[in-house]
Every structure is written in C-alpha cells, then in structure tokens.
C-alpha cells in the first residue's frame, strides 16, 4: 500500500497475559497500573519462548465488541482444558501460517499456543519402542483435542517390568489400574507433543504404520523396549561346551500389529542399519506375522540392546549379556514451546463490565501470550490506502511416508500433506 495508517487492535481487560514466571495477570491491570513486568514472548531469531520487558502501555478507549476465543489445551481434567482470550476483530493472532486478524479465524482453525514439552530424549525413545510393542497412543477424552495419551499394559507375570518402565516416565502425570486378572495398566496425561506422532502411526486401518522417518528415530533403547514387549527368546545352548562357547539361541518378535508395509520396512531397517539377518514368517494356527532372527543376528542384536534391558528381563538374553543394564530415569524440566492448537469456540462479547480496549508493547520481539495464545502487541497500523496487489499463501508440509514397489522396482511414493 502507498499509505500507512494506524489501527487499534487490542484485548479486553479480562484477558490473561502470561508473565515470565508462568503466572498470569489481567491485561487491563497491567496497563492501568503501568506494571513494570516481564512477559513471555516468542523470539523469532532463536525460535524460543523467552522473557521480555513491557515497554509501553495503551488504553485505546471503549470497544463496541470483543471476540472471545476458547482454544484447546492438552491436559483435560487438570483444570486447564482450554485457553481463553478476548480480542478486537482486527487484533493479530499467530497461526501456523502466520499472523491473521481475529475476525478471519474460525472455529476449527489452529492458532499457536505455548504448551509444555515434558518428554526427555530418553522418554521419547521409550515411547517409540512402546508403540512398536504393547503401548498405544489413544485419543484424549475430548476427541477433537490435538493431543494424545500414552497407555501401557502388561500381564501380572510382568509386573516388575511394568514398574520399571513406569519409573522411567514417572514425571508425567499418570494413573494406574489393575484388572480382575491382575494385568496392570497405566494411562498418562494427554500430551500435545504426542499428537503428531499418533496421527502418523494410526492411519485408520487398525494397524500401526511405521514410516521410514519413524524407523530412523529408533535407538538401542527403543529396540530394547520393543523386544522386551513383544519378543521371545529360545536358548539353544548355554555355552558350557567349547564349540558353543558364549551360548546361542534365536529371537522371534511378533509384528502382527503393524501394517504389512511396516513389517517389510522394519525387516529392511534391521538388515540395512544393523546388519541383522532377519526374515518374516507366519507363525502358529493364527498365522501371525513374526520376525525371526538367525543365531548370529540374535547374538548381535542382544549385544546392542543388553545395556538397555530391564534387569528382570535377563531371561531374554544370552548368559554372557547378563548384568549389563545401565538405564536410569532421565527427566527434564518442562520447556514451553509453540504448538498448533484448535479453536473450539468463538463468541461475540458486547457486555463486559469493562469494555475498554488495552494493549502493551513488548521489547524486541513485539508479541506476547494471551493465556498461552501468541498475539501481536501494539502499536499496530491500519490498512492505509491505494492497495496495489493482494497475496495469499498456504504452507504445506509434504512428507514421504512409504515407498510403493512392484517387486524390487520403486513405482510410486505415498505422501502425507499437512496444511
């Protein structure tokens, strides 16, 4: 545009601003008292949420209307099931594709919400291994919530292993139950950071889908969890004689819960990445898919995972690999990160006891969080005049999730596109 004007996008008195220590304060109170405070703000250069000083305060007079938004927040049942903010129609709110005016956002759209990331690298590895085995990612109580809940269950005879695994995830809020047969289950609090993983693994056909990217994320700890969950070991020799020194045996791991393509990719991954001689076969009257390791591959695989096995699972190892377990819990302090969150409700408000419109200016980064939702700060500019051209852009994240083959020839790719 040739001309620059001024606009007065603002928030209501009652909108909670997230302060640097994680607490909140009413926007109107911050402005009226010109509070010298630091707020949380997103730094585009570092890609981190950081504390920033408020450098100016604005009361721009009475507003005729505010748009009150409710935004889904992971952790339903903790009293923080949604974020809440009220803005004028022209206030800028951050979305996954950039800044948008409040009036252009609809129910079902996504905005950027600061949410805690709780999982350490070690715990992420455990999640990946558990999903390949006895674990699952279930939807939260609110089906439209963009989070996922990790659930793990084991029979009564594996109670020690169950306790060991839960101890590695003990900092995540959870509840434990036991059924009539003595089987134990643990349900962890929904986490926003697991939503994308759940979307990638469960495609709606009842089988778990493991992409090439998923397999690249596996570590020896992930493989150990998978093996302890679904693997069996047949010890053929304890190695008491010289010709069988060190012992020998064979591993079989059930992969029936995975899609056929995932079974093949996993077999190829084990061969190409770890040099393991592994084949797929159908086992038993139910013809369930299992991965069968050769004797040499069994020893090589167990050498890889032995340091990450639970002590109570030593019976799944050759005798020479006993006593190598060295896993200890690795917890991290929660880190606030921007994550897309769904708008669940928008309501026009014209009857607040205080209808004045307020805003603040934030040092350097010029944004702050309204109850966790990223919004722009003042001062802002109006539309001006003499518009020459208008542009619209949509960002698409295209990922290859499967290579389709005809025999050994690659004929196509299966992709997922996220708008």
Curated annotation (Swiss-Prot):
Function field: Can catalyze the hydrolysis of ATP in the presence of single-stranded DNA, the ATP-dependent uptake of single-stranded DNA by duplex DNA, and the ATP-dependent hybridization of homologous single-stranded DNAs. It interacts with LexA causing its activation and leading to its autocatalytic cleavage.
Superkingdom as given in the UniProt entry: Bacteria
Intrachain S-S bonds: none
Pfam families xrefs: LAGLIDADG_2, RecA
Chief location of this protein within or outside the cell: cytoplasm
Keyword Ubl conjugation (UniProt): no
Similarity section: Belongs to the RecA family.
MF terms (GO), sorted A to Z: ATP binding; ATP-dependent activity, acting on DNA; endonuclease activity; single-stranded DNA binding
Xref: SUPFAM superfamilies: Hedgehog/intein (Hint) domain, Homing endonucleases
UniProt PTM: This protein undergoes a protein self splicing that involves a post-translational excision of the intervening region (intein) followed by peptide ligation.
Keyword list, A-Z: ATP-binding, Autocatalytic cleavage, Cytoplasm, DNA damage, DNA recombination, DNA repair, DNA-binding, Nucleotide-binding, Protein splicing, SOS response
GO biological process: DNA recombination; DNA repair; intein-mediated protein splicing; SOS response
ATP-binding among keywords: yes
Gene Ontology CC, one term: cytosol
Species whose genome carries this gene: Mycobacterium gastri
Compartments it resides in: Cytoplasm
Identification of the protein by name: Protein RecA
């Amino acid at each position: 545009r040739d001309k620059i004007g001024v606009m007065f996008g603002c928030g209501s008195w009652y909108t909670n601003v997230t302060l640097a220590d994680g607490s909140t304060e009413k926007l109107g109170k911050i402005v009226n008292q010109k509070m010298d405070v630091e707020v949380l703000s997103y730094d585009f250069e570092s890609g981190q949420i950081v504390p920033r000083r408020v450098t100016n305060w604005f009361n721009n007079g009475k507003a005729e209307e505010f748009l009150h938004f409710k935004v889904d927040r992971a952790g339903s049942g903790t009293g923080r099931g949604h974020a809440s903010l009220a803005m004028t129609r022209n206030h800028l709110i951050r979305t996954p594709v950039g800044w948008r005016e409040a009036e252009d956002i609809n129910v079902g759209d996504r905005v950027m919400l600061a949410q805690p990331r709780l999982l350490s690298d070690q715990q992420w590895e455990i999640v990946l291994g558990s999903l390949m085995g006895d674990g699952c990612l279930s939807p939260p109580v609110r089906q439209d919530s963009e989070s996922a809940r990790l659930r793990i269950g084991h029979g009564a005879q594996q109670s020690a292993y169950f306790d060991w695994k839960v101890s590695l995830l003990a900092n995540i809020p959870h509840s434990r139950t036991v059924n009539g047969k003595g089987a134990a289950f643990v349900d962890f609090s929904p986490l926003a950071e697991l939503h994308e993983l759940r979307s990638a693994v469960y495609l709606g056909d009842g089988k778990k889908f493991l992409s090439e990217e998923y397999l690249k994320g596996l570590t020896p700890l992930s493989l150990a969890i998978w093996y302890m969950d679904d693997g069996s070991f047949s010890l053929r020799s304890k190695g008491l004689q010289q010709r069988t020194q060190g012992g020998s045996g064979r591993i079989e791991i059930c992969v029936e819960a995975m899609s056929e393509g995932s079974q093949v990719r996993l077999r190829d991954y084990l061969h190409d990445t770890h040099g393991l001689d592994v084949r797929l076969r159908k086992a038993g009257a139910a013809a369930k898919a299992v991965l069968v390791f050769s004797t040499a591959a069994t020893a090589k695989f167990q050498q890889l995972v032995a340091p990450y096995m639970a002590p109570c699972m030593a019976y799944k190892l050759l005798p020479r690999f006993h006593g190598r377990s060295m896993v200890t819990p690795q917890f991290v302090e929660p880190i606030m990160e921007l994550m897309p969150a769904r708008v669940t409700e928008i309501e026009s408000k014209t009857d607040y006891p205080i209808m004045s419109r307020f805003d603040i200016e934030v040092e350097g980064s010029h944004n702050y969080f309204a109850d966790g939702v990223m919004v722009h700060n003042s001062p802002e500019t109006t539309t001006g005049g003499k518009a020459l051209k208008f542009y619209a852009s949509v960002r698409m994240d295209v990922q290859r999730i499967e290579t389709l083959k005809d025999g050994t020839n690659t004929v196509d790719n299966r992709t997922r596109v996220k708008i």
